[in-house]
Swiss-Prot record:
It comes from Encephalitozoon cuniculi (strain GB-M1) (Microsporidian parasite). Disulfide bonds: none annotated. Residues 56-212 form the FCP1 homology domain. Keywords: Cobalt, Hydrolase, Magnesium, Manganese, Metal-binding, Nucleus, Protein phosphatase. Residues 309-393 form the BRCT domain. It is found in: Nucleus. The gene is FCP1. This is RNA polymerase II subunit A C-terminal domain phosphatase.
Amino acid sequence: MGGCNHPIRLGTLCGVCGMEIQEESHLFCALYNTDNVKITHEEAVAIHKEKMEALEMQMKLILVLDLDQTVLHTTYGTSSLEGTVKFVIDRCRYCVKLRPNLDYMLRRISKLYEIHVYTMGTRAYAERIVEIIDPSGKYFDDRIITRDENQGVLVKRLSRLFPHDHRNIVILDDRPDVWDYCENLVLIRPFWYFNRVDINDPLRLKRKIEKEAGENKALEEFVSKRKKIEDIRNPEIASRLDDMVLESSCGSEGVEDDSRSTEEKEVSEVQSVASGDSELLKVAGFLRKVHRKYFASKQRNVKRILRKIRRRVFGGDRFFVAEIANRAWLVKTIEMYGGIVGIPESGVDFVVSSCEREAEYLAQKFECLAVSPKWIADCVYSLKRVEYGKYVVCDHRTKDEYEEELERLFT
């Protein structure tokens, strides 16, 4: 490496001797709050092994925790609703609702897991949120990584946090796609309170970045507005115009206005469901179960434990998924939880469709049950095969299959 064997890099410079390192090598981001400081992969693995051994001695696992829709819901703008927290970053207003039982879960789980926050929000946003849910720093310390330090990508990877050996790491997130359906993932039902908008949705952020990249004209107009503001001598007028420009830029992010009143009924329904949310209580119990199984096992591998639990959900059931909006999510999720998707030679057990006419046609064709996609979601979030009675769209099973099902249920 150009005559320098030191393990630390600051950009293209050695962090110890200052020598410029021209040739590239396999480096690892050493810190959470920046991706500019790196160490060699060998050094990272050595540090990681030492840390993992210390955690094993403490009988602790690692929990990588998402924020948005996992433990809270954030919207732009203000709200008069009780139990919400408001703050401002760069003149954009945010309103946050914490998921019920969050503090209980953190108190219980922090005794068994070292918790790391991994969010697609910005560094400023994440730090403000953490101040709200962990003001003393006892749960997260400085273990926070955001999209600002995520090496320019809008997906999450355990390799960004840990260079080696992920067998003792559990992920808690509402988005399996962001993790590319990683085997360490525990999926939680998304938490919605104000509306159904995820302000830090990676797909939305990607579209925004692509849009901004091609808006040179809009950028020029923005700069022009700023220049006019700077030319005005009256500070009160300048401040007001500045606010107008910022409101305009924040508007594309989803700042809500009086038009929200047209959605009051839907929002009220979402809040009614959210107020009775008990998902974090269930998750706390499940994470304790995983912890117990891990330290009782000789192999000690979280992925193996989670894989076994997940595959019991659909346990070899055969599915045909219709062409619907969220088909990719359904197919990958069904397979991840032990189902078989396609048209196996042995037949089909379930057709999944939200269209009644299509479900009727396919169920007749395959002589099987047709269920709504909601059944798949509820099974996955419950980590068990829930009774499908209320999710059935139509039933075209043969008599023999129907009698076998009755026998299974009542014997």
